[in-house]
């Protein structure tokens, strides 16, 4: 699933081609993804794209006729091409075409993403309930420690909760907990202030490095230029079950936590008794 670094990579990849452009047409080939595609999208001819931004895993196109919320879902990706350059494929569900012939193409084999229109993205219900951005100054050790009090949930599930902090998906939660030396099943309420300080620090580091590497490509995700994300080459625990830990040589284990596969080193990430 594309996570925060993949969406940020997509944003940085498409922004130079779309900022300031006028929408000529939005071609919708599939009426329903995760939700029905907003009818308003097909009536945005003449709208100017005045800005592009990201909030959590949502890419937002801000236009003179409202905002477009895009979520990549489980398998979505965005590409830039020229009009009539390449016929749409089976999984190419939406094309946003600008007046100069630039095409933003949305590909999504599993159709779990979304394209929604809203008057103001900041006031949309999908956005207003979100927690702080992990790379922002508001995501601090003091904040995380305060939110973790009386939370019996596993720390991995805790940091993946978008109400707590956005964008820390399964891959980056596993990697961050390894870097912090924390077992994924540790109860959030048992985190110390020092552990929260370390965890916040490594979450920021892991996500920043992943963005530099263009995200992580495991199966479907590609960058807008067609290249894969290269962070997969430096994963320490995720997807490495039965392989040796790079730090201590102990065999990496996997366990389902919160309905997701979780990877950890039982030596570097001991669970306190």
Curated annotation (Swiss-Prot):
It holds the Pfam family H2TH. Binds 1 zinc ion per subunit. A zinc finger (FPG-type) spans 236-270. Keywords: DNA damage, DNA repair, DNA-binding, Glycosidase, Hydrolase, Lyase, Metal-binding, Multifunctional enzyme, Zinc, Zinc-finger. The gene is mutM. Monomer. Disulfide bonds: none annotated. This is Formamidopyrimidine-DNA glycosylase. It comes from the Bacteria. It catalyses: Hydrolysis of DNA containing ring-opened 7-methylguanine residues, releasing 2,6-diamino-4-hydroxy-5-(N-methyl)formamidopyrimidine; 2'-deoxyribonucleotide-(2'-deoxyribose 5'-phosphate)-2'-deoxyribonucleotide-DNA = a 3'-end 2'-deoxyribonucleotide-(2,3-dehydro-2,3-deoxyribose 5'-phosphate)-DNA + a 5'-end 5'-phospho-2'-deoxyribonucleoside-DNA + H(+). Signal peptide: none annotated. The active site is at 2 (schiff-base intermediate with dna), 3 (proton donor), 57 (proton donor), 260 (proton donor). GO terms for molecular function: 8-oxo-7,8-dihydroguanine DNA N-glycosylase activity; class I DNA-(apurinic or apyrimidinic site) endonuclease activity; damaged DNA binding; zinc ion binding. Its cofactor is Zn(2+). Its EC number is 3.2.2.23, 4.2.99.18. GO terms for biological process: base-excision repair. Involved in base excision repair of DNA damaged by oxidation or by mutagenic agents. Acts as a DNA glycosylase that recognizes and removes damaged bases. Has a preference for oxidized purines, such as 7,8-dihydro-8-oxoguanine (8-oxoG). Has AP (apurinic/apyrimidinic) lyase activity and introduces nicks in the DNA strand. Cleaves the DNA backbone by beta-delta elimination to generate a single-strand break at the site of the removed base with both 3'- and 5'-phosphates. DNA binds at residues 91, 110, 151. The keyword Zinc-finger applies. It comes from Actinobacillus pleuropneumoniae serotype 3 (strain JL03). Belongs to the FPG family.
